[in-house]
Amino acid sequence: MIYEYQNKLPQIDNKSWVAPNAVIIGSVILEEETSIWWNAVLRGDNEKIHVGKGSNIQDGSVAHTDPGFGLYIGQNVTVGHMAMIHGCTIGDGSLVGIGSIILNGAKIGKGCLIG
């Protein structure tokens, strides 16, 4: 489900895939070949969420922001099932493990494993 919020509509590349019951709200950009899986929520209501090319956000994960803390996910990143990512930066090629929590202001480098 795709929702406009405060006159901001998610921008989803036509080569991306979003599960029918995933929720994407507001200022969210999905680059090409991204995938958002079942029950994931991307809530760009406070700041922008940017998901880089080839990245995936798996089942039940939540991506959110706070004022002053946008969320940037690099290219070819995997966000595992039920992860909570909030107002952070995740570098290219990183893996955020199942159930991981990353909070405001965290900066994860390229090729990292968070678990």
Task: Label every model-predicted segment.
Residues 1-16:
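Extreme N-terminal tail/first-helix region
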